[in-house]
């Protein structure tokens, strides 16, 4: 009985463990980036031939002491390497992990190699040579603390190298990751039932090839010409055992029935590459390949009358100018799954979970966080069996909303007000193509909540009820409201997010409330923004400031723009879109500065010299900077006592120092827009005028129809130097 360790990418361990169990492995133990198991020599070779998800199969030889380099050398020297490798043979070593005395994997590998060749030279009179490519024996050393484990790499090189991929495109999908995506989408079971498979953005063809190999019961190692066990001398009968396994795999392949598998890409060059790879995999005739746009896909006339499986890996859109294109691409994919392929299982690997919202699917998918090489990705599954735990990223329902007692009469009263508001705003929303707006804001005293629309999502903010209203009554009214929202607004219940807005103390209006990560991509005036619907009190996009952002965009051309207390940088994006010469965004929060940078990159704005992001206390920064600007947006918090600040900040108390200090940064003919959401705010007109400032209140000009309420949600002034 041997002990083995099969390595794989993080996140794929469940698929690998299930695979090994099906092969007959014993004591299967999932670990980080791999799975331990036990079995005879046959199970090790079978894993090399049949594992679609493993990267390497390591046969464990011995635990050793690696507390010092000398201990490592001495321990390895005790192993009878002459029984594993000829003196005239070649070897290579891999060292994974470090400790306090072996601080670099290259050093650990060197000590391992020295001990092996010294042992063989002492026993045989000559020593093996080192070969980096396809050695006779590849030795693996894993270090954890003072303990190491030495093993033989039976695979020899990564098992993802199936042998069929001649060429690839950008960010190619590793073959073992592709196989895991298919496992997670349930393709193996569906293929046995005769379900069809589609990949409408197949790139170099990895997913359809892996789908065909899985459906056709083709051993993923059958095309490989090299394995690490081929010239390993540590066991007898390997050649005969391997031949038997190979013959068995051919018999299994001959008995399998291949379902319909179709793939395509809009890029003619990628279709050509995919065709060459399909031929190299000996699968021509089994995969139908098309040059076709995602929007052009329809069900084939000969497809079985049953739902199939779609798995795809769309482009990641990391280059400038691709973001808008990608949003359209994901929208087309969503239309395909909502239309011709309605009811199909699907798995979509995306470079950013934000793209999920662009697909417009009625249900929130299960999410898995995976990596395609160095690129972090989200794998979104629809129509598959739910996992024991909710997928990361799915909004957790607020307790009681699904099962509470609802008063039909009260609920209808709230529904009528929603319909009235929708009717009032409909022309404006349609004419201006408004995607994010406020539909309701405590318009009825009984229902103290705000309802905001973010494209196909709805966010409900329940205001904290006065102490005179019992909690049970407030909760019952929330039940009433939420019971009618999906039907009136035409959204599924899963796309209604409920939060409670309490009186904020200091900077905690920006503190994290949850960690569900429900991020959505929304559009405003042709620009794209990331919003987080669940984790913070505010989403990252203030709907009430939409007119102010439009004004900034209209006035930014050839101007130097400053955004103080920049939050998620939405005003900065508008300024850049308006042609600002430079933009500077200042905030004390790393979280929001990084968010602001993502928003800029979403819209194709990069360049650290043209667009600067500064982490600083804004009050201190304006007092020390020598920069000047033509256009400034100042939207400070009402109050802040962040732990990163030495003193608290109060907009009513500190307005003269703040506004005066910011106005000092204005160039001649420059404009400062100051906005505040503080209720009962009183501008110190006389004190500011004494600083030679001219102030014009423009509050009504900065409110769209969805915020025409009294008192206004914010007040705003246009300030210039007199």
Curated annotation (Swiss-Prot):
Top EC class of this enzyme: transferase
Any one of the GO CC terms: cytoplasm
Domain spans labelled THUMP: 43-154
SMART domains: THUMP
Record's catalysed reaction(s): guanosine(2445) in 23S rRNA + S-adenosyl-L-methionine = N(2)-methylguanosine(2445) in 23S rRNA + S-adenosyl-L-homocysteine + H(+); guanosine(2069) in 23S rRNA + S-adenosyl-L-methionine = N(2)-methylguanosine(2069) in 23S rRNA + S-adenosyl-L-homocysteine + H(+)
Source organism superkingdom: Bacteria
The keyword Ribosomal protein is annotated on this UniProt entry: no
Gene3D superfamilies with a match to the protein in the record: 3.30.2130.30, RNA methyltransferase domain (HRMD) like, Vaccinia Virus protein VP39
Localization annotation: Cytoplasm
EC number: 2.1.1.173, 2.1.1.264
PROSITE patterns per the UniProt record, alphabetical: THUMP (PS51165), UPF0020 (PS01261)
GO molecular function annotation: 23S rRNA (guanine(2445)-N(2))-methyltransferase activity; RNA binding; rRNA (guanine-N7-)-methyltransferase activity
Function: Specifically methylates the guanine in position 2445 (m2G2445) and the guanine in position 2069 (m7G2069) of 23S rRNA.
Similarity comment text for this entry: Belongs to the methyltransferase superfamily. RlmKL family.
Protein name listed in UniProt: Ribosomal RNA large subunit methyltransferase K/L
The species this protein was found in: Magnetococcus marinus (strain ATCC BAA-1437 / JCM 17883 / MC-1)
Gene: rlmL
């Amino acid at each position: 009985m041997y002990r083995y360790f099969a390595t794989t990418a993080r996140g794929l361990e469940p698929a690998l463990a299930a695979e090994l169990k099906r092969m007959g492995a014993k004591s299967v133990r999932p670990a980080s980036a791999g799975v331990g198991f036990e079995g005879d020599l046959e199970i090790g070779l079978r894993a090399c031939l049949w594992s679609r998800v493993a990267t390497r199969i390591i046969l464990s030889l011995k635990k050793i002491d690696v507390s010092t380099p000398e201990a490592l050398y001495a321990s390895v020297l005790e192993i009878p390497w002459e029984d594993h490798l000829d003196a005239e043979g070649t070897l290579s070593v891999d060292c994974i992990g470090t400790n306090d005395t072996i601080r670099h994997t290259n050093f650990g590998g060197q000590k391992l190699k020295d001990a092996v060749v010294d042992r063989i030279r002492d026993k045989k009179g000559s020593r093996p040579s080192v070969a980096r490519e396809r050695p006779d024996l590849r030795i693996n050393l894993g270090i954890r603390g003072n303990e190491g484990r030495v093993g033989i790499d039976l695979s020899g090189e990564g098992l993802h190298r199936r042998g069929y991929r001649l060429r690839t495109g950008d960010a190619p999908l590793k073959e073992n990751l592709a196989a895991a995506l298919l496992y997670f989408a349930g393709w193996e079971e569906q293929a046995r039932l005769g379900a069809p498979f589609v990949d409408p953005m197949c790139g170099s063809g990895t997913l359809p090839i892996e789908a065909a190999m899985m459906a056709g019961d083709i051993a993923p190692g059958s095309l490989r010409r090299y394995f690490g066990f081929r010239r390993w001398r540590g066991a007898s009968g390997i050649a005969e055992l391997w031949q038997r396994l190979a013959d068995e795999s051919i018999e299994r392949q001959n008995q399998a029935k291949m379902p319909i598998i179709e793939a395509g890409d809009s890029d003619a060059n990628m279709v050509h590459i995919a065709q060459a790879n399909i031929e190299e995999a000996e699968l021509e005739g089994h995969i139908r390949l098309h040059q076709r746009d995602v929007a052009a896909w329809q069900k084939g006339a000969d497809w079985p009358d049953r739902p199939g499986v779609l798995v795809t890996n769309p482009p990641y859109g990391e280059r400038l100018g691709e973001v808008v294109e990608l949003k359209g691409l994901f929208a087309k994919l969503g239309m395909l799954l909502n239309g011709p392929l309605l009811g199909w299982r699907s798995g979509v690997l995306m470079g950013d979970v934000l793209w999920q919202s662009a697909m417009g699917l009625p249900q929130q998918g299960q999410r898995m966080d995976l990596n395609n090489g160095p690129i972090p990705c989200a794998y979104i599954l629809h129509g598959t069996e739910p996992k024991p735990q909710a997928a990361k990223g799915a909004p957790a329902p607020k307790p009681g909303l699904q099962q509470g007692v609802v008063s039909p009469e009260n609920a209808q009263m709230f529904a009528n007000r929603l319909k009235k508001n929708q009717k009032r705003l409909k022309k404006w929303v349609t004419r201006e193509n408004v995607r994010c707006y406020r539909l309701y804001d405590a318009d009825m005293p009984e229902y103290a909540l705000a309802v905001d629309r973010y494209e196909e999502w709805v966010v409900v903010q329940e205001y904290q009820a006065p102490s005179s209203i019992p909690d049970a009554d407030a909760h019952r009214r929330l039940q009433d409201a939420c019971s009618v929202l999906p039907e009136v607004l035409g959204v599924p219940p899963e796309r209604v997010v409920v939060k409670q807005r309490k009186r904020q103390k200091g900077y905690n209006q920006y503190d994290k409330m949850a960690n569900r990560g429900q991020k959505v991509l929304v559009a405003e005036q042709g620009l794209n923004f990331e919003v987080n619907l669940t984790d913070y009190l505010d989403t990252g996009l203030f709907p009430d400031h939409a007119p102010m952002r439009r004004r900034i965009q209209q006035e930014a051309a050839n101007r130097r723009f400053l955004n103080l207390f920049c939050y998620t940088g939405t005003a900065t994006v508008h300024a850049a879109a308006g042609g600002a010469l430079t933009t500077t965004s200042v905030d004390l929060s790393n979280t929001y500065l990084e968010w602001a940078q993502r928003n800029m990159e979403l819209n194709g704005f990069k360049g650290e010299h043209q667009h600067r992001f500064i982490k600083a206390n804004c009050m201190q920064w304006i007092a020390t900077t020598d920069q000047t600007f033509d256009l400034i947006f100042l939207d400070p918090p009402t109050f802040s006592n962040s732990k990163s600040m030495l003193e608290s900040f109060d907009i009513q108390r500190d307005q003269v120092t703040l506004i005066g200090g910011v106005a000092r940064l204005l160039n001649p003919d420059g404009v400062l827009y100051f906005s505040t959401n503080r209720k009962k705010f009183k501008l110190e007109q006389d004190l500011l005028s004494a600083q030679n400032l001219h102030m014009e209140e423009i509050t009504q000009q900065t409110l769209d129809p969805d915020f025409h309420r009294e008192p206004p949600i914010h007040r705003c002034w246009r300030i210039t130097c007199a």
